[in-house]
Swiss-Prot record:
One of its GO terms (cellular component) is ribosome. The keyword Ribonucleoprotein applies. NCBIfam families: rpmJ_bact. The gene is rpmJ. One of its GO terms (biological process) is translation. One of its GO terms (molecular function) is structural constituent of ribosome. This is Large ribosomal subunit protein bL36.
């Protein structure tokens, strides 16, 4: 999974934007290896 500060989804390749637990993910059913997650604030310990 690629983690970047801004995610870009390409619907023509089957990408879908999903928000889970306050984070933005790009998932793809056609190409399951094509995943992205938007980097949020660092985790508190």
């Amino acid at each position: 999974m690629k983690v970047s500060s801004s995610v870009k989804a390409d619907p023509s390749k089957g990408d879908k934007l999903v928000r889970r637990k306050g984070r933005l993910y790009v998932i793809n059913k056609k190409d399951p290896n094509r995943k992205q997650r938007q980097a949020g604030p660092a985790r508190k310990k």
